[in-house]
A protein has these predicted regions:
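Alpha-helical assembly-interface signal, strongest on the long, hydrophobic N-terminal helix that forms
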Residues: 1-74
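Long, compositionally biased low-complexity segments
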Residues: 61-400
Length: 400
């Protein structure tokens, strides 16, 4: 009897040990599921931020391309009028007249092609309805919505289900609405001005700087110096950030004595061209670049200005909402995930809590330098974090 009793006790002990082991394995598996779900949700949010960074860079490049297109059309029209006028003067120089005629025809064809291309490209890039920029901005909004409660819960639910059919996981609600205010669409003028400054810094020198040059001719003047050609050109963005304008002019300037003083004035416009994208004004409004030195050429450029209304101004990017961030240099966004395993009865359910955060850090292989967080470089990552006291308290309200 004693041996039989010991055998029964041994079997019961083995069963208890087995069930305890099974429970420990199940609990650890649920903890791992919660960690995986939290990290997956945070990773998705990091990818959303990185998408914003990539799309913001694409939008900036798109704005640069529009500025380049406007500048190219203006310069092509300027070169067309310059070569056409040169060909007219070539009638007085028979040996070079055929060459100047061919150059003028080629320039006219190039200007025609540039206008036709810009008429398609600028609306395709900047149209407020179906432009590439608008599509990128809409994609940013869709991605942002996917990182909110419903979309994020779909991620955690799929991760939990892949771990075990009886596992469920969801993101705990954030009473501070930290993620909702983590980023925001630029709306204020100062926000758009910052984007415009970044875009203009990305322009090549030919577009960003005034295109000014003084060319001395062999024609003497009574001022004891030579007559000169004055080239003036500039590409500008209007103060309201809604219109691009580019102008190029070249005029012959006459120097003469007047009341014992040497004076200079525009005598003959030789080349001119202008283009605008946005609000159609058919007039040169730029005040920079010394365009006033060639008033006649400037007026002719405005009268023949290429115009397209298929542009709605500098883009409104989605950026970090610095006003709502506790740390504006290295902000992070937390989330907490609670996982549950159903075992039939409500009292037999198991629960697990895990937290993760999204943070900004340059990759290990990048040059060693300090870089503050932004939505222009895709360096957002995710990692697990220790649940906070507030998250633990909130999780207790979810347990039944």
């Amino acid at each position: 009897m004693l041996a039989l009793g010991l055998l029964v006790l041994g079997v019961l002990a083995l069963r208890l040990l087995f069930e305890s082991g099974q429970l420990t394995v199940a609990r650890q598996r649920l903890i791992d599921t919660a960690d995986a779900a939290a990290l997956s949700a945070a990773t998705w949010r990091a990818r959303v931020l990185n998408f914003h960074a990539y799309s913001n860079r694409a939008i900036i490049a798109n704005e640069v391309a529009i500025a380049q297109a406007v500048t190219l059309v203006a310069w092509a029209q300027y070169f067309e009028t310059l070569t056409r006028n040169s060909a007219a003067f070539g009638a007085y120089l028979p040996p070079v007249e055929p060459v100047l005629g061919v150059v003028a025809e080629t320039a006219a064809l190039a200007a025609q092609v540039s206008r036709a291309t810009a008429a398609i490209e600028i609306p395709a890039r900047g149209s407020p309805h179906v432009g590439y920029k608008t599509l990128l901005q809409s994609a940013q909004e869709v991605m942002h919505l996917s990182s909110l409660g419903f979309g994020l819960n779909m991620v955690t639910a799929e991760v939990a289900r892949a771990s075990h059919p009886d596992h469920f996981a969801w993101v705990l609600p954030d009473p501070t609405q930290g993620w909702s205010g983590f980023t925001a669409r630029a709306s204020e003028g100062a926000d758009r001005k910052r984007v415009a400054d970044l875009m203009q810094a990305s322009l090549d020198p030919f577009i960003r700087q005034p295109r000014s040059e003084d060319i001395h001719t062999p024609i003497p003047s009574l001022c004891l110096n030579l007559m000169r050609l004055r080239k003036r050109g500039v590409t500008t963005l209007s103060e309201d950030l809604e219109r691009w304008e580019s102008v190029d002019t070249l005029s012959f300037h006459l120097r003469r004595l007047s009341w014992f003083r040497c004076r200079e004035r525009e005598a003959l416009p030789l080349g001119w061209g202008a283009a605008e994208a946005g609000q159609v004004l058919h007039a040169v409004t730029a005040t920079s670049g010394d365009l006033s030195l060639n008033p006649m050429a400037r007026q002719l450029a405005g009268e023949s200005m290429f115009s397209t209304s298929g542009y709605e101004g500098i883009a409104r990017l989605r950026e970090l909402n610095y006003e709502s961030l506790a740390n504006t240099r290295f902000p992070s966004a937390r989330l907490a995930v609670i996982a549950r395993r159903d075992q039939g009865e409500a009292h037999s359910r198991m629960w697990a809590l895990s937290s993760a955060e999204v943070y900004f850090r340059r990759p290990p292989g990048a040059p060693q330098r300090t870089e503050y967080a932004s939505l222009f470089n895709p360096y957002w990552q995710a990692r697990l974090a220790e649940p906070s006291v507030a998250e633990r308290a909130l999780a207790l309200t979810q347990v039944d």
